[in-house]
């Protein structure tokens, strides 16, 4: 799978990320680093532990990484979850987290095909 195909498969903004970052090799390298990013596992653990402040930090980090990499289909639900957690409570997290998890799994699967 090419980098552009991977972005299409995940609903990402290939054109936008290519305008922001210097080269396809650079984008590919940083996109693959997403597989080692711990913000999603930290988010999931924090939600399971009912730890709203840690969940907020993890969701905010995930949102930022997705925005920088042009992972738009994951950025949108991660952003919604971040805003819900911003107030320091878990209100709404039970309904907002599943779309984040679904899109995260889709991104991870596509990135593994890119390797």
Predicted regions and their residues:
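Two-component system phosphorelay core
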Residues: 1-57, 61-115
